[in-house]
From Swiss-Prot:
Belongs to the FAM24 family. InterPro entries: FAM24. GO terms for cellular component: extracellular region. The lineage of its organism: Eukaryota, Metazoa, Chordata, Craniata, Vertebrata. Residues 1-29 form the signal peptide. Keywords: Secreted, Signal. This is Protein FAM24A. The gene is Fam24a.
Length: 98
């Protein structure tokens, strides 16, 4: 009835159609599962005491005790700080290098 080329084309087309239908079905099932899970979570949240839920989710931070900053002594050369490494001479003057 059909030649070999036509049978191959029909086979490929039907395979692609079946694969597309399977993928659409899988995506639709996943969508339904996710929407059902979100709906259940929303219903559970509405039944809970809102102040209790907020306090349970809150993580309290530990206070950080700051060490006093040590004063930096200014050098005469280019008004650099002693603790900082020396800068190249082009950075000493404000107009140098421009």
């Amino acid at each position: 009835m059909f030649d070999l080329r036509t049978k191959v084309m029909i086979g490929i087309a039907s395979t692609l159609l079946i694969a597309a239908i399977v993928l659409i079905t899988v995506v639709f099932c996943l969508y339904l599962k996710i929407s059902k899970a979100l709906k259940c979570a929303r219903e559970v949240e509405s039944c809970m005491d809102p102040t209790k839920a907020v306090s349970e989710k809150m993580i309290r931070g530990k206070p950080i005790i700051a060490d006093p900053c040590r004063p930096l002594q200014c050098c005469d050369n280019c008004s650099l700080f002693k603790d900082v490494g020396a800068m190249p001479p082009c950075f000493c003057g404000t107009n140098e290098g421009l």
